[in-house]
């Protein structure tokens, strides 16, 4: 049955632009957009339900394309210690940092991880998020990476959202592989990835290419394994130093390379040629008080598509609001509101390989959209907080919180 959503204005975000339709309407049929356009051009038809949006602005549902939403515990005490002058290295040496999250995640049951993640993600839903990517990477062995990926699949079953799972086993070196990074990478490639993929738990494969994680050569080993399994790849790259990770990602036609503060112009050109999306993570940049900015002008100059994401994680970006990330993207990285909104809609969809079905409001695409109590789409980026979403629609059905 067809449902009519009328009396609204629409920012479709086609081609990464507002692409306004004023005095508009949307017709949904099942989970898809059947028709979209000016209300005066609405075809004569019979509708099972008519919804008056009362002049609201409508945007595509938000897509959070880089998160670590499943984890045990939190690191708020470490946050306070850092502000008291304790260095990250000192925290890590005392058993804190990512090691503490690995311990807490390993100790937690599937049910505990699921319940804590659902609380966080429901907050994001209320902010307009309808699609989310979630990474593993706090288990760091087969049993616990599997546990995390099973929880991610369960989130997709429990919530009316599109949920994509990414295996990030190559996130950090687990304690049982201390000083044996090559052996751990071999374990990922010969044991973990093939088994997890065979169980249908993996949509994409990610790795952390950095001096404190894994080298480009080690990451390439992971990428080759993913490629042999038919899985797309993504990469944490150039966050703290320039190792050429983003160029490596481009060579393997990665969906995205993420962080990118230290990427070079050659890296940018390589990503432009491969079509790899640049995912910027201003929440981590903000919390870590970084001073090295991603090369925004170069990315734009060379036509690299820019996405934004929360990077929700317990250590460096405990961000539960993608709208706050929008403002950070504009304020810190000087993206225009239009560029920022493209970064959490159509460009974020491209970073997940979903651009044919998600990310913009067009006939035939999935009916994920948000109605906003605003006078112009730039307000979504401008306001810090506030109850702006009037309705969140997922697969053609309004989400009731």
Swiss-Prot record:
The source's superkingdom equals Bacteria
* Gene Ontology process terms (BP): L-histidine catabolic process to glutamate and formamide; L-histidine catabolic process to glutamate and formate
State its cofactor.
Zn(2+); Fe(3+)
Q: What is its EC number?
A: 3.5.2.7
Give the binding site residues for Zn(2+): 66, 68, 236, 311
Principal location class: cytoplasm
Q: Where in the cell is it found?
A: Cytoplasm
> Could you say which enzyme class this protein belongs to?
hydrolase
**What GO molecular function annotations does the UniProt record carry, in alphabetical order?**
imidazolonepropionase activity; iron ion binding; zinc ion binding
Keyword annotations for this protein, in alphabetical order, are:
Cytoplasm, Histidine metabolism, Hydrolase, Iron, Metal-binding, Zinc
Q: Where is Fe(3+) annotated to bind?
A: 66, 68, 236, 311
InterPro entries (alphabetical): Amidohydro-rel, HutI, Metal-dep_hydrolase_composite, Metal_Hydrolase
**Where does this protein hold N-formimidoyl-L-glutamate?**
138, 313, 315
Q: Pathway, per UniProt? A: Amino-acid degradation; L-histidine degradation into L-glutamate; N-formimidoyl-L-glutamate from L-histidine: step 3/3
GO cellular component terms given for this protein: cytoplasm
The record's Pfam families line, in alphabetical order, gives: Amidohydro_1
Among NCBIfam families, the record links this protein to:
hutI
Q: What is this protein called?
A: Imidazolonepropionase
